Amino acid sequence: MKRLLISCLAAALLFSCGDANVLPEQYRQNDQKTKEEKQENNNNQEEENGNQGQEPQEDEGFETAAEAVVHMGAGWNLGNTLDSNSGDAEGMWIEAWSQRTPKDYETAWGQPETTRALIHMFKEFGFGAIRVPVTWYPHMGTITLYDNDKWDQSTWTGTAVDPAWMARVKEVVDYVIDEGLYCILNVHHDTGDGSTAWLHASEEGFLAAKDRYQALWEQIADTFKDYGKRLLFESYNEMLDPLGSWCFASFNAPGSYDAAVATSAYNGINSYAKLFAETVRASGGNNALRNIIVNTYGACSGDGTWSSHLKEPLTEFVLPEEPGHIAVQVHSYWNDEAFSSQKSDIDKLFVNLDTHLVKRLGVPVIIGEWGGKTKNDQSNATFAAYFAGKAKEAGIPTFWWMGLSDGDDRTVPRWTMPKTMGAIIQAYNQ
């Protein structure tokens, strides 16, 4: 199943095509590596003063968010995998036609089960980080269907995450951490414009969902509280107003703007960000100093000049805590085939991020998703070389969405878009 990602300029999923570079045989062994990161950064001190659960200190291995983003470099999204879900309350096909096992969800959108060898391939070729998108609603509480495949969200009860699902998420995170890579773990298609989304950017939406949202992050934070600095939590993916407006809040309103809807949406986003930060910090263990990530409205990056409201997701965002262990994330998709005419717009994007986020808030920025519109490896490589080069100059890590290794190529594992992969790595290594 294909999942469309929408942005102001373009949207795309990148599926299997083109030449492929295969990971050497010696790297396809499912070896059990030592968990150096978690052991090195387990900072619950008990030696001298007996203060069990004492908060970790900076000199015990944790770094600032600004340091972390520089160390990440090139990243990739393990997309259409743990984020897979039915996505339609009128057609809950996974729930209706499967046993609802972790594998049923992980493979529902056409990707194989994630392996350690796949993650190792990214490490071997020079990537520094992997974002692990996770959709949680199918695995929280009890979802009861009617008419075989329909879901009335008002009947949703309970907030406990299925232990089997949490265990699989943890296993995949361990693959990333064990390779010495940074890992971003998030709340993904619980947001967006689908009818199964339950997190909406509005004051009313926040009040309705805040208890469930807090309960979810309490469970995630507790599960991973002893992990070291290479694990980052991301608050939510692309949260939209109740109208499902992309680009900026209330874009789908009559006249393409409604000040009241927009204000409520930006207030809602800021409230979710604040609750997320407070919940993680209160959860104990290494979460007191863990680097966390909050996204702008819709993860919008202010691309374009066709509306005076395009910069609002940046200018209206309020940082939920003092800078130090927090970063802001945006997403940015482009038409790779029209790249030559977009260079100046890409340049402006990085100026806007610097002006409205880095300098205004004193916070580092992550581009958590980016990509081109087509599956053409050569045109994407040309575009990626320029975009990644500008990001490297700005000190911003970028996470390409999906297609570098896709579908059956992940099983080998090998590259689906080797030229694009190489262009990204070269840009960050210059």
Predicted ranges, named:
Residues M1-F15:
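Sec-dependent bacterial lipoprotein signal peptides
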Residues L13-E60:
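Bacterial Sec-dependent N-terminal signal peptides
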Residues P56-D59, G110-E113, T305-K311:
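Short gly/ser/thr-rich secondary-structure transition/capping motifs
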Residues G61-G302, I424:
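Active-site mouth of glycoside hydrolases
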Residues T101-K103, A215-L232, Y236-P397, R410-A427:
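Extracellular glycoside hydrolase catalytic/binding regions
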Residues M140-G141, D193-G194, E337-F339, D408-R410:
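A short acidic, helix-capping loop that chelates divalent metal ions and anchors anionic groups
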Residues W401-D406:
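Acidic carboxylate-rich catalytic motifs and surrounding loops in phosphoryl-/glycosyl-chemistry enzymes
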